[in-house]
Amino acid sequence: MTTACISACARSGRVAPVSQRVSTPSLEVHKIVAGVWRHVSYQHLKKWGWFPSNGLIVETSAGPLLVDTAWTTEQTRELLRWVQRRWNRLPVGVVVTHAHDDRLGGLQVTGSVGITTYMTKAVADQAHKQNKSVPRLHIISTPVVQVRDVEVFYPGGGHTANNVVVWVRRARVIFGGCLVKSAASRGLGNIADATLETWSASISKVARRYPTARYGVPGHGSPADLALLDHTRALLTSWCSRHRSRCGH
């Protein structure tokens, strides 16, 4: 995989370890496979310090498509500048995978330049309940739908009740978002809006629907293969064994 860092880290040719960063880290763009990139943005969290969040840039027949914005407005502006330099145009749309800031924190930026937002009604409703603006909204009305050249699939609740995953068939890349944990994860992370009783079943639906996936991209952390799904289920099993009432047992 190749990596591009915007602004200062592009000039230095390297990325400082997260623990050494003082100012907000620059956006990073990592090539996964031909036509698919992972964008990585950061937010400072009290418990973990500077914490990375993943989204995708997918080259489609209509032009570049974003899966989730960057975490902040400024990093989303950086993301749009990267796309503009690469394709000499703005993205044709942004698919939002759930209604947390690490997925839609830059929607005001994308909306201000006319980029269409694709999300399910459930995600849109949740965003509105949180008083988040959703500009240029196009509602995804079915559990499985094609958006440009990608498939958006709602497998059931997990990290949130309304999280979706995105399948890039030609590249065999599945973007699991925060439904899927990275191999380095040792816990479930933020479960404030989780539906713990259905999460494992939702992971199983993703595994059955996309058995040929070569790359799995979690919401946070490094991509891997479909072993990420097994790892997520194992984390759920461990957590639920200690909190049985929270998991519907």
Label the predicted regions:
Residues 62-65, 74-118, 211:
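Active-site metal-binding motif and surrounding structural segment of the metallo-beta-lactamase
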Residues 31-80, 164-178:
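Conserved beta-strand hairpin/beta-sheet module of binuclear metal-dependent hydrolase folds
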Residues 10-23:
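Short, low-complexity, disordered segments immediately C-terminal to signal peptides
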Residues 24-27, 31-32, 63-65, 71-72, 113, 118-158, 162-227, ...:
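Metallo-beta-lactamase
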Residues 1-12:
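N-terminal export signals
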Residues 35, 58, 68, 83, ...:
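Divalent metal-coordination and catalytic microenvironments
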Residues 228-249:
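Binuclear metal-ion centers of metallo-dependent hydrolases, dominated by the metallo-beta-lactamase
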